[in-house]
From Swiss-Prot:
Protein name: Maturase K
Presence of keyword Plastid: yes
Disulfide-linked positions: none
Function: Usually encoded in the trnK tRNA gene intron. Probably assists in splicing its own and other chloroplast group II introns.
Classification via HAMAP family: MatK
Localisation per UniProt entry: Plastid, Chloroplast
Family the entry assigns: Belongs to the intron maturase 2 family. MatK subfamily.
Species in which this protein is naturally found: Picea glauca
Record-level GO BP terms: mRNA processing; RNA splicing; tRNA processing
């Protein structure tokens, strides 16, 4: 693989050819078989992974030949049963073929991405969750509408093959991919003609399909944004384990009016702000209501013509920033005007200017979170804490760890929001529910549990919040802490409760369109 990368750097044209012979490299399937064993060792007993199941490379060659014939004599997905006792050897060969196919396709894809970021000194790689917080902290002086779009994830297999065909010249190497995609579609329970490319099964193959599909979607969007806003954007490549995103460069340029000696300094700030996490993307644009409607109509139509798929109307929602409050990414998002008084003194004259900028004001959805906690049996509908009876069979440490994990994820994810006082109500519900769960387990009362454990009860749970919200030394520092927002970079994903609440909001929008 390293040699292939080196040759591809010397001649970027040959990387699109001669991919098919790589499918018959024995080292490739040895690597893919090791990856399969490493991924399954955590969920399967070790006795089923003994050395008696020898890996035969001849069987893999025969498997590839059957895929090329397309006679449906081999079934890759139906026989991939999670039960290790049911035809496990056939499942291992199928997974090895998928791993090998993914490894071959990743090589030109990664080289292509490497060329797109070459020469960029300030390029950095972030996970997609970390691109949300700079977007929420960004100023929106030239935007008055926001569009919340969900990327369609149901797509025809042939469209996926065509996206690979645009940058891979070796057509025979795509025949196994086409056969596998069609077989996966035929083996699924639904009778639809499309397949789901969202990686519900966390495999290397489906992660690669999803990242490549999102890469194509955003590459189209970038070209449109460049033409509409005349902004200079840097397109960052997407490696198989990373997420494609875009970072704008802001600079100042000088232009002059006709028939005038005055020069005007203008800020070359793009009128379109973009961020994506998972299947959701947010675009903040400037324009009238008619212009926003044109954008809302043009972008889905362009994507439909490019990918030959239909977008449901409820997947694109537009809101006016100054009037409406939208829900996205687990927040209630609204805009607020932030006035700034600027005083400039030149000789004896004093100029005063008022600058007004718009910024996001993310709000914690307290009532929906309490509703989700009641659904998970942490409290009732009114928010009164109750014991988690399903956890009484666990140890005390496991119970404390689980409550600690829930509160830590909630507090870290919403720590940068304004008006965090509602989070302390969530803290009260979780802490009292934890105490009631321990009391129910030991068949005692909350008072006895608090008396026996004392400060050790919540030594691990809810301790991070004390460190972050420690009282400052001065009132000026206290006022500053209320104005500033602190985002924690150790958030791996959207909070599960926020994700569930967002699904409920999406279902409400879908029901409105169905009526």
């Amino acid at each position: 693989m390293d040699e292939f990368h080196r040759y591809g750097k010397e001649d970027s044209s040959w990387q699109q050819c001669f991919l098919y012979p790589l499918f018959f490299q024995e080292d490739l399937y040895a690597i893919s078989h090791d990856h399969y064993l490493d991924g399954s060792s955590s969920s399967e007993p070790m006795e089923h992974l003994s050395s008696n199941d020898q890996f035969s490379f001849l069987t893999v060659k025969r498997l590839i030949g059957q895929i090329r014939q397309q006679n449906h004599s081999i079934v890759l997905f139906v026989n991939c049963d999670p039960n290790p006792l049911v035809d496990r050897k056939k499942s291992s060969y199928s997974e090895s073929v998928l791993e090998g196919l993914t490894l071959v396709l990743e090589v030109p894809f990664s080289i292509r991405s490497k060329y797109s970021v070459e020469g960029m000194n300030e390029w950095k790689s972030f996970r997609s969750i970390h691109s949300i917080f700079p977007f929420l902290e960004d100023k929106f002086p030239h935007s008055n509408y926001v569009s919340d779009t969900r990327i369609p994830y149901s797509i025809h297999p042939e469209i996926l093959v065509r996206t690979f065909r645009r940058w891979i010249g070796d057509a025979p190497s795509l025949h196994p991919l086409r056969s596998i995609l069609y077989e996966y579609r035929n083996s699924s329970e639904s009778l639809q003609r499309s397949i789901i490319v969202v990686p519900k099964v966390n495999t290397r193959f489906f992660l690669f399909l999803w990242n490549n599909y999102v890469y194509e979607c955003e590459s189209i969007l970038v070209s449109l944004l460049k033409r509409s806003s005349h902004s200079r954007s840097l397109s960052h490549g997407s490696f198989p384990q990373r997420t494609h995103f875009h970072r704008k460069i802001k600079n100042i340029f000088l232009f002059s009016r006709r028939n005038s000696f005055q020069s005007i300094w203008s800020l070359k700030d793009p009128n379109i702000h973009y961020v994506r996490y998972g299947e959701r993307s947010i675009i903040a644009i400037k324009g009238t209501n008619l212009l926003v409607k044109k954008y809302r109509y043009y972008l889905p139509i362009f994507r439909q013509c490019y990918f030959h798929l239909w977008n449901e109307p409820y997947r694109v929602c537009s809101h006016q920033l100054s009037k409406n409050c939208s829900s996205s990414l687990g927040y209630f998002l609204r805009f607020r005007m932030k006035p700034l008084l600027v005083k400039t003194k030149m000789l004896d004259e004093l100029f005063i200017a008022d600058l007004i900028t718009d910024e996001f004001d993310p709000i914690v959805p307290i009532v929906p979170i309490i509703g989700l906690l009641s659904r998970e049996k942490f409290c009732d509908i009114s928010g009164r804490p109750i014991s988690k009876l399903s956890w009484t069979s666990l140890t005390d440490d496991d119970i404390l760890d689980r409550f600690d994990r829930i509160w830590r994820n909630l507090f870290h994810y919403y720590s940068g929001s304004f008006g965090r006082d509602g989070l302390y109500r969530i803290k009260y519900i979780l802490s009292l529910s934890c105490a009631k769960t321990l009391a129910c387990k030991h068949k005692s009362t909350i008072r006895v549990v608090r008396k026996e454990l004392g400060p050790e009860l919540f030594k691990k749970s809810f301790s991070k919040e004390r460190e972050l919200d420690s009282p400052p030394f001065s009132s000026k520092a206290a006022a500053r802490s209320q104005r500033e927002r602190i985002w924690h970079s150790d958030i791996p994903q959207i909070n599960p409760l926020a994700h569930s609440w967002q699904k409920i909001q999406d279902l409400k929008i879908e029901n409105l369109f169905d009526q």
